[in-house]
Amino acid sequence: MPDWVLAIILGVVEGLTEFIPVSSTGHILLLGHFLGFHSTGKVFEVMIQLGAILAVISVYFGRLWSVATHLHTDPAARRFVASIVLAFLPAGFAGFLLHDYIKAVLFETPAVICVSLILGGFALLAVDRIQREPVYTDAGAFPLKTAFIIGLFQCLALIPGVSRSGATVAGALLMRCDKRSAAEFSFFLAMPTMAGAFTVDLAKNYKLLSADDAGIIALGFVCALVAAIITVRKVVDFVGRHGFAPFAWWRIAVGALGLLGLAFIG
């Protein structure tokens, strides 16, 4: 299969899965393993994530701009920013310290990804079925303690296959946030988290950048951006109607198929 076709596939998969609780990293790594995509290696995976980051900024630009311009006068805007920063810190700190181990060991073990997808799917099913009356319905007004605990849950996503979105959504639901606000807070938290991961990965892999790969990277980036914009615009309403169970079953199916593929194909 030509590299440009694989770049389109991986870019679309990145965009579609980054902001739903199915683990974009798990999907990208498994696809890369089975499809044999090695043209740009780690650099490609890093660069297409930037497309997903820009998608959130694009969709929520008006809201983010309002927060930024009222930061000096509006206590609610300052608390929202503080909640995102506080939620980011645990995974940001742990990810920085464990980056090399995670990339060298966990990211190179497809079986770990498959098992994480399956276990995370069952965990998401359990959390989704908890019938507790939501206390918090506005992602911009979560208490700081709630935001920090959601951030602790995000640390679980350092294990590939767990899903950053899945971990933060599960944490938010357990803290009695409603499903729509849990999804939105996960979007906002994704921006500093993914930007931090992007910066660290790029700093460690920039020497691998090559002008020969620019076209493939650009193609994957654009596909990820467009797919992520569509996903971010649709997923909150979908979650409000259907909950997170469809994503949980998808995770379980992908993880099981991945294990079968590893057993019979390698």
Curated annotation (Swiss-Prot):
GO terms for biological process: cell wall organization; peptidoglycan biosynthetic process; regulation of cell shape; response to antibiotic. GO terms for cellular component: plasma membrane. It holds the Pfam family BacA. Its main location: membrane. Keywords: Antibiotic resistance, Cell inner membrane, Cell membrane, Cell shape, Cell wall biogenesis/degradation, Hydrolase, Membrane, Peptidoglycan synthesis, Transmembrane, Transmembrane helix. Its EC number is 3.6.1.27. GO terms for molecular function: undecaprenyl-diphosphatase activity. Disulfide bonds: none annotated. It catalyses: di-trans,octa-cis-undecaprenyl diphosphate + H2O = di-trans,octa-cis-undecaprenyl phosphate + phosphate + H(+). Catalyzes the dephosphorylation of undecaprenyl diphosphate (UPP). Confers resistance to bacitracin. Belongs to the UppP family. Bacitracin is thought to be involved in the inhibition of peptidoglycan synthesis by sequestering undecaprenyl diphosphate, thereby reducing the pool of lipid carrier available. This is Undecaprenyl-diphosphatase. It comes from Phenylobacterium zucineum (strain HLK1).
